[in-house]
Amino acid sequence: MTAKIKVLQVIPKLGYGGAETGCYDLGHFLAENDCKSYIITSGGELIKYVRKDKVKVIKLPVQSKNPIMILLNSFLITLIILFFNINIVHVRSRAPAWSCLISCFLTRRKMVTTFHGTYNFKNAIKKIYNSVMLKSKLIIAGSNFIFNHINENYIDKLDPTNKLMVIFRGINLDYYHEKNISVFKKNKLFNLWGLSENKFKILLPGRLTSWKGQDKFIESLNILVEDYNNYRFEAIILGSDQGRNVYKKKLQNLSQRYNLNQKIFFIDHCKDMPLAYSLSDVVVSSSVEPEAFGRVAVEAQAMQKPIIASNIGGSKETIIDKKTGFLYKYDDPRELAKVLNSVMELDKDTLNLIGNEGRKNVSKKFDVDKMCQTTFTEYKKLLKN
């Protein structure tokens, strides 16, 4: 009988982001496939949903970028690796990656990294800091965009003996499914948000930050009214400001200046995202900087909603333009308004057809089981070498 593979995942915080949900999904997949699954994290809202009988969660301050804490964490992670006899350490962020690099060196364990973002670098020191994500035996890029970004910017940091590959992020298609939506809950949320009947609902999900382009989205809604005389919509900007109070105030002031405060609804959080998607007629991703993957676009398609997204980053891979959604020139509110107006003129059957094609697209390429199975297969290959 072969021994169970023991995998330790390390992530700063187990919240609702793409990296975090990927960690959560993989942790449970491993437990259900005869592995021992462990997660080190500092905390996060997703912890309460972890099946404690399947996945062991260990809390450490791995969110800290303080060099002293990074060294302390490396000592503690080393003890955890030895105590639980961990085979593979899979890390998803830079600060804890430095801790894990030291721990894996001391314990001679295999390290895996997932390169989740573009990790901006303005100087050589920052680039060296980022390069820790390339020090593992297996480097996973969540999209072709990230794969190309690594090759274009870090080719001098890549060790040819390490494996760099694309494993597309996946989502839970059973969770993101229209069939699970309760009419009662849908009506309740509709009333809670104060939405109106017979208005075209435009949903923009994502935390409030300038690179997500919420300000450009509001400008596009003003153009929709001014240039197209189109008032037939309500827009929901769904996301926490995460302490960015000044930016949120800017968005609210912009909404008032354009006399759109009766048409734009700012919602801080919705724990049931499939329910939120179900209220919409179209979903928008207005990012002005590249998304590493573009989870919103994939979730929207899974929920059979047309998606409009800026033509940069991962969205170009997840959306089939003019079939499952529409791409527009990023940072261009005028073009976004034009696309919005065109989508609003489509009949219900055409919108449903686009939604159905979106679901097919996600089922084929971005299923969470496929992501987890591919990762698990690579783990086994790594342990054989």
Q: What kind of feature is each model-predicted range?
A:
Residues F105, M111-N144, N148, L158:
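A conserved, positively charged/aromatic
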Residues S136-V166, I171-Y176:
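A short, active-site helix/loop in glycosyltransferases that binds the activated sugar's phosphate group
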Residues G243-K248, N261-C270, A276, F326-L327:
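Active-site donor-binding acidic/aromatic loop of nucleotide-activated sugar
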Residues P306-A309, I319:
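Short hydrophobic beta-strand element within catalytic cores of glycosyltransferases
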